[in-house]
A protein has these predicted regions:
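Active-site neighborhood of divalent metal-dependent phosphoester bond hydrolases
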Residues: 5-6, 18-99, 125-134
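Conserved beta-sheet core of the metallophosphoesterase superfamily
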Residues: 120-187
Length: 188
């Protein structure tokens, strides 16, 4: 895809822990922020990493879920200040949801009867659609989410909810969709 300065590019999170080059992914997202209107959402993997880096939280869960790959990509040498300042600023700029006309975006899911600005972070970052697919949101907008992998490589479109996680981390596709035209891009 080739977004222009007038385009809004919303990325749904899990930029770290999902492959061998988390650092390169963050560099590219920072670069995109200078080329287009980029809105980055906070995923559960960014949350786990920031809890360790900023709050010295226990690190075992993060390391079990891809943190080792992230540390390797940053050539971790034992100090929790391994993130370059520009990367830490990027992570601190991530939001839990974003709204556009007709759509809203979260990393994982939402509670259908609660306004977006009152949603629990756990719901927005951690809830799996495998556990429960939410009903339409009270805003009437279509939800666009990731987090729950569609292992068949297809976008899940339920009308009121679109899940674009097509299992990139597990060997599937990295997927982008232009919501107004419906055009889809996928790379492996």
């Amino acid at each position: 895809i080739h977004p222009t300065a007038e385009d809004t590019l919303v990325t749904l999170g899990d930029y770290v822990d999902r492959g061998p080059d988390s650092r390169g992914v963050i560099e590219r997202l920072i670069q995109l922020g200078g080329e287009t209107r980029h809105v980055g959402l906070m995923g559960n993997h960014e949350e786990m990493m920031l809890e360790v880096v900023k709050h010295q939280a226990p690190h075992e869960m993060w390391l079990r879920h891809g943190g080792v790959d992230t540390l390797d990509s940053y050539a971790f040498a034992g100090s929790l200040d391994f993130l370059p300042d520009s990367h830490l600023e990027f992570f601190e700029s991530l939001v839990d949801f974003h709204e556009e006309r007709g759509h809203f975006f979260t990393h994982a899911a939402y509670a259908p009867k609660i306004p977006l600005n009152e949603q629990a972070a756990d719901m927005l970052r951690w809830h799996s659609l495998d556990d429960m697919v939410p009903q339409p949101h009270l805003s009437g907008k279509v939800a666009v989410v990731g987090h729950t992998a569609n292992k068949d490589g297809e976008i899940l479109d339920l009308g009121h909810l679109i899940c674009v996680d097509t299992y990139c981390y597990g060997g599937g596709w990295l997927t982008a969709i232009e919501l107004h035209s419906g055009q889809v891009w996928q790379v492996s």
